[in-house]
């Protein structure tokens, strides 16, 4: 019996991004001429009894003490929420902002808490693409562009 090898699809993924949202956010920052890095550094943090690393999705250098970090999220899993609370506790000066596909999604099937409400309760800035039809609020874009003038 003759065996056939499976051919690889000519449409294999060529993007370096983990999601379409990350790719589109990358294109948005590029179009706005905002300097940024994509998953280009790691932040060490401790989970109880375990050293871990966090790689931010996008980071925009600024002339401020810290860069602005953007986490793009379609789904906001419990593990992500726990991780970001630990990082916020260990690095309170980091400016981590969430960019959600839809911040009105609930954090769980039985929960009444939305992604937006969770961010408000935990002190994180966030933005909703779905409700604004924008990747970032104009104020954030201006803030970053102003802080990158001298870089």
Locations of the language-model features?
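Detector for Asparagine
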Residues: 26-27, 59, 63, 102-105, ...
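Active-site metal-binding core of divalent-cation-utilizing nuclease and nuclease-like domains
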Residues: 6-18, 28-66, 72-81, 88-89, ...
């Amino acid at each position: 019996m003759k065996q056939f090898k499976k051919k690889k699809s000519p449409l294999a993924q060529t993007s370096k991004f983990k999601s379409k949202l990350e790719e589109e956010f990358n294109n948005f920052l590029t179009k706005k001429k905002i300097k940024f890095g994509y998953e280009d550094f790691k932040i060490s943090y401790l989970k109880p009894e375990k050293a871990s690393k966090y790689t931010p999705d996008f980071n925009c250098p600024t002339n401020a003490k810290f860069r602005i970090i953007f986490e793009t999220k379609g789904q906001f899993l419990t593990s992500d929420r726990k991780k970001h609370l630990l990082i916020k506790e260990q690095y309170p000066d980091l400016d981590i902002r969430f960019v959600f596909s839809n911040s009105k999604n609930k954090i769980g099937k039985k929960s009444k808490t939305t992604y937006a409400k969770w961010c408000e309760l935990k002190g994180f800035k966030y933005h909703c693409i779905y409700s604004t039809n924008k990747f970032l609020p104009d104020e954030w874009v201006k803030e970053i562009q102003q802080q990158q003038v001298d870089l």
